[in-house]
Every structure is written in C-alpha cells, then in structure tokens.
UniProtKB/Swiss-Prot annotation:
The chain crosses the membrane at residues 89-109, 300-320, 350-370, 386-406. Contributes to K(+)/H(+) antiport activity by supporting proton efflux to control proton extrusion and homeostasis in chloroplasts in a light-dependent manner to modulate photosynthesis. Prevents excessive induction of non-photochemical quenching (NPQ) under continuous-light conditions. Indirectly promotes efficient inorganic carbon uptake into chloroplasts. Belongs to the CemA family. This is Potassium/proton antiporter CemA. HAMAP family: CemA_PxcA. It is found in: Plastid, Chloroplast inner membrane. One of its GO terms (cellular component) is chloroplast inner membrane. The keyword Nucleotide-binding does not apply. InterPro entries: CemA. Residues 159-278 are annotated as: Insert. The keyword Cell wall biogenesis/degradation does not apply. The gene is cemA. It catalyses: K(+)(in) + H(+)(out) = K(+)(out) + H(+)(in). It holds the Pfam family CemA.
Length: 425
C-alpha cells in the first residue's frame, strides 16, 4: 500500500510538471508571436512614414502615376470622384467657418440682450448705489461738466445788462413793462410841437430767431434834436426812450409802452439777474442728469459686454473641440488654395498681412484697437499701458511671422520666400 501511494504521488508530480512546462511553452510562443508582431508593425509603420529619396524627385513619380491612371483607367470616374472630393472639401470649409464665426456671435447677441443685460440692470439699479464703474469714468464726467460750465460762462460774457431791452421778439414778453400796444403809426415828417424831434435808433440787436423774412425787428429809439432823418414818430415821449418794432415791408412802426429807465433800471437789472441765474441752474441740472444717465448706462454696458464675451469664448472653445475633423479639413483646403496661387500673389498676400499687423503704420492701428477694447470693457484708459502693449505685441507677432516663413514656407515654396524678400528690399 505504501508503495502504491508513493507511485501515485510521483505520477501526479510528473503530470503537474508536464502541464506547467506546456503552459510556459505556450506563453513563450505567444510572447514570441507578440514580439514578432510588434516588430513587424514597427517595421510597417516605419515603412509607411518614411519614404526614400530616389534618383528622381517625388514630384516626377506623382506626375507619372497620374499620367498612367489617366491613360489606362476610367478617366471619367476619376474626374467625377475628384470633383466630388473638392466639392465636399469646399462645402465643409464653408460650413465650418460659418459655424465658428456666427454661432459665437449669435450666442453673444442673444445672451447680451435677453439674459445678461436685464440681470445686470436689475442688480446695478437696485443693489448698487454707484453710478461710475471706475474713477476714469468719474473723471471724464467731471471734465464734461466743467466744459459745460465754461461754455455757460462764455455765453454770459456775451450778454450785456441792456440786452433785456434789445433782442425782444413779438412772442417773448419776459418783462411786464414791455407790453405791446395795438396802435400802429406811420412815419411822418411833421410833429405837433416842432419839426426837430426825430426818432433816432440808438442800438439795434436781434437774436438768430429773428433773422427770418418779413419778421418784425425790435430796437430802441431815442428822441433828439438831430437833422439826420430816421423814422420820425408822431408823438413826443418825455422819458426820451421808446421801444418799437418796425415792419420795413409795410413802412410801419408798432409802438411799445414807454419805458421810464430812471425808475425801472435797478428793478430790471435785478429781474434779469434772477432770470439768468435760474436759467443757468436749470441748464446745469439738466446736464448733470444727462451725464448721470449716460455713465450709468455705460457702466451697465461694460459689465454686460464682459460676461457676454466670456460666454462667447466658452462657446468657441467647445466648437473647436467638437469640430476637430472639420477644422482639419478646413485647414487643408485653405492651405491648398493658398499654395495654388502663384509666387507673386502669395508674396503679396503675406506682405499685406505682415505690414498691416507689424508694419510702419501698425502702432496707430494697435493703439486704436486697445482704446476700443478698454472702452468696451469699461477699463481705465492708461496711456502707459497702451504704449507698453503697442511696443511689445507687434514685436512678438513679427518674430512669429519670421519663424513661420523660415520653418514652413521655406520648405513648401522656396520661390515664394525669395519673391517675398525681393518685394521687401
């Protein structure tokens, strides 16, 4: 019994050893197959990606290949397939550019007018007590108000104290002492007391509103013993002054009520000063309200522009990730169109873009761009920051253009690079 048990255990051990050896052999064979497959795949990848340079250029091989295809194969189907392929490339490019351009703009417009702006207006007008978004807007508002005050002061210097008597129109009766009577007197050379009393106009001033055709002019007459003939009045006024309106087309003078300047001069000055002061205060109040409303709207607009542009940028990034295949097709089509041009046109296009962005006149364009950008987002306009950006950004773009021309264009089209340098020189 002991001998039989030992024999069975020995056979089991032999069976286990043979089984594990067979498994190891299979694993080794599978590993060898995988290694051989990986080596063959590497060789295939290398053979696919690497193309040996032969005796003739590769363009000759492509030309001969195309020639034999047109000679021995069905040319009509090849032409139709090629046309369909380029049509697909063109439609894909147009569709991709349309989506990348108009979808972010549409998101910007809709979110700005129907989502972000109402929320911003509600928060800014209810929870915020400020009008100005930053100190730069406040400084601009104070500058405009100061200029308006200087304008009013300049207009007040042009007005004299006697202008309450000159420049009165028929529809303007500011002072009750200058009420027009309904009596019209014709010019006459005879007077009931003496022939030497004539009405002599002392001054004549009119507003711009009176410079219309057949409109009555208002001026001041002074009676004096002068032989120089001016419109002679039929009445003698003891005060020596008379306000009259003359209609020269009818040769008539319509009399106003006499003004006794000796009694009413101080009162007229006081009335004029009070009226002028009241009008100046009203104009200042109206201007201040206009400035407050304008800069409040400008602050809301700046905040709305910022959040709407952020949302548009997120949309653009999503489209760039989502439309990766269409973007690659678009790039290949645009590159093919670009390299399909002749050397002079390619050089002219490159020269136009580089001169526009980094040329001699580009600092003015960049300065205008940054000023518009700061106004768009309500940022304080700092000339130092603008000059710093204008001095650095075109230099970086110039270096980038030179690298692209040297790295890529010099390989793809050396004749274009030579033509470009010839145009620059």
């Amino acid at each position: 019994m002991q001998y039989s048990s030992k024999k069975n255990s020995y056979e089991d051990q032999n069976f286990q050893n043979r089984f594990f050896n067979s498994l190891n052999g299979q694993n080794k064979s599978s590993l060898n197959q995988n290694s051989s497959f990986s080596e063959s795949s590497k060789q295939q990848v290398v053979s696919i990606t690497y193309e040996e340079i032969g005796l003739f250029p590769r363009s000759f091989n492509r030309v001969f290949d195309r020639f034999f295809k047109q000679l021995f194969f069905d040319v009509e189907n090849l032409v139709i397939q090629e046309y369909r392929f380029y049509r697909y490339l063109f439609l894909t490019t147009v569709k991709c550019l349309f989506i990348l351009l108009f979808v972010p703009l549409g998101i910007n417009f809709l979110s700005k007018n129907y989502l972000i702006r109402p929320v911003t207006e509600y928060y800014w007008n209810t929870h915020n007590h400020e009008i100005f978004l930053n100190s730069y807007q406040q400084k601009r508002a104070f500058t405009e108000l100061k200029n308006f005050e200087e304008k009013i002061y300049f207009e007040s210097l042009l007005l004299s104290e006697n202008q309450i008597f000159f420049g009165l129109s028929e529809k303007n009766s500011t002072f009750p002492s200058s009420e027009k009577s309904q009596k019209s007197e014709h010019f006459s050379n005879q007077d009931e007391h003496t022939n030497d009393f004539y009405g002599k106009p002392k001054k004549f001033q009119t507003d711009s509103s009176l410079q219309q055709k057949n409109e009555e002019k208002v001026f001041l007459f002074e009676n004096s013993k002068s032989l120089a003939f001016e419109p002679n009045l039929n009445q003698i006024h003891s005060s020596g002054f008379l306000i009259a309106s003359a209609d020269f087309s009818k040769n008539e003078v319509q009399n106003f009520q006499n003004l006794n300047l000796s009694n009413n001069t101080s009162q007229s000055k006081t009335d004029f000063a009070s009226v002028f002061r009241t009008s100046v205060q009203k104009r200042l109040q109206v201007k201040i309200l206009e400035l407050a409303k304008h800069y409040n709207e400008e602050s809301i607009e700046a905040i709305t522009n910022f959040f709407a542009d952020v949302l548009s940028f997120i949309t653009l990034c999503y489209l760039l990730v989502r439309l990766e295949i269409q973007i690659n097709i678009t790039k290949s089509f645009l590159l093919e169109v670009f390299f399909g041009l002749d050397d002079s046109k390619k050089s002219l296009l490159i020269l136009f873009i580089t001169d526009l962005l980094v040329g001699y006149h580009s600092p003015n364009i960049w300065e205008l761009f940054f000023q518009t950008l700061f106004d768009h987002y309500g940022l304080p306009e700092s000339q130092t920051t603008i000059f710093l950006l204008v001095a650095t950004l075109p230099v970086l773009l110039d270096v980038l253009f030179k690298y692209l021309i040297f790295r890529h264009l010099n390989r793809a089209s050396p004749a274009t690079v030579a033509t470009y340098h010839a145009m620059i020189e």
